[in-house]
């Protein structure tokens, strides 16, 4: 459903819609390769968002600083970022990555779903992502464009 909706939505853009669809999916049809690309895209998006958040933090703290949002030149308006908080945050991140590594390396399927091993089938919507009945008219309108 998601790949079909995105495909139809992108193809509705005048002049460049077909090119966008072919760029995203490699073609207009929704088949096994398309669904695998869709799943891979959804795997990568959280990392892209994390990178954008990190870039935002770096840019925010680089010149003006979070304690000086107006850009006032005097240092008396800035609040120093205490080294204690940096150390505390680093310890927390370190512990988080240790726990995450235990799950990833020793129990990789503990937090997974058995449906992850089912081959993608474009003709059958998995029960977990069947759209709600009240969204079906909007999908029908979108498909008719």
From Swiss-Prot:
Residues annotated as transmembrane: 38-58, 85-105
Classification via InterPro entries: Cyt_b/b6_C, Cyt_b/b6_C_sf, Cyt_b/b6_N, Cytb/b6-like_sf, Di-haem_cyt_TM
Positions that bind heme b b562: 42
Gene name in the database record: cob
Subunit details: Fungal cytochrome b-c1 complex contains 10 subunits; 3 respiratory subunits, 2 core proteins and 5 low-molecular weight proteins. Cytochrome b-c1 complex is a homodimer.
Keywords: Electron transport, Heme, Iron, Membrane, Metal-binding, Mitochondrion, Mitochondrion inner membrane, Respiratory chain, Transmembrane, Transmembrane helix, Transport, Ubiquinone
Cofactor(s) demanded: heme b
Binding site for a ubiquinone: 61
Organism: Aspergillus flavus
Protein name: Cytochrome b
């Amino acid at each position: 459903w998601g790949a079909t909706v995105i495909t139809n939505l992108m193809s509705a853009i005048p002049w460049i819609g077909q090119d966008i669809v072919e760029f995203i999916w490699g073609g207009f049809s929704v088949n096994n390769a398309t669904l695998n690309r869709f799943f891979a895209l959804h795997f990568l998006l959280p990392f892209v968002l994390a990178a954008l958040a990190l870039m935002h933090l770096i840019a925010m703290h680089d010149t003006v600083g979070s304690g000086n949002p107006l850009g006032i030149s005097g240092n008396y308006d800035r609040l120093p970022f205490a080294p204690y908080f940096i150390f505390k945050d680093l310890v927390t991140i370190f512990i988080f990555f240790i726990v995450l590594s235990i799950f990833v390396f020793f129990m990789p399927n503990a937090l997974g779903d058995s449906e992850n091993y089912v081959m993608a089938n474009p003709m059958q919507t998995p029960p977990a992502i069947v759209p709600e009945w009240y969204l079906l008219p909007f999908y029908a309108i979108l498909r008719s464009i």
